């Protein structure tokens, strides 16, 4: 289900505040955030935001195609290491 139009999109206040301050100063530093559920706004274009994946912060450069999506969509939280292969004898090889 999508969010109600009367509520508007969610963006963490601390994140939007940092973006606005950097836009006023003309800076382009990496911003760390744990807010994966924040919606990407047009004001964020050109910035690099380090989004937490549960273990580390992964830098994400914001482009035009990302506007309207959530930050968490661009940072995976799980790593797939592949299925285990079997040898001729039936023992597993990693």
UniProtKB/Swiss-Prot annotation:
The keyword RNA-binding applies. Protein S19 forms a complex with S13 that binds strongly to the 16S ribosomal RNA. Coiled coil: none annotated. This is Small ribosomal subunit protein uS19. One of its GO terms (cellular component) is cytoplasm. One of its GO terms (molecular function) is rRNA binding. The gene is rpsS. The keyword RNA-binding applies. Keywords: Ribonucleoprotein, Ribosomal protein, RNA-binding, rRNA-binding. GO terms for biological process: ribosomal small subunit assembly; translation. Belongs to the universal ribosomal protein uS19 family.
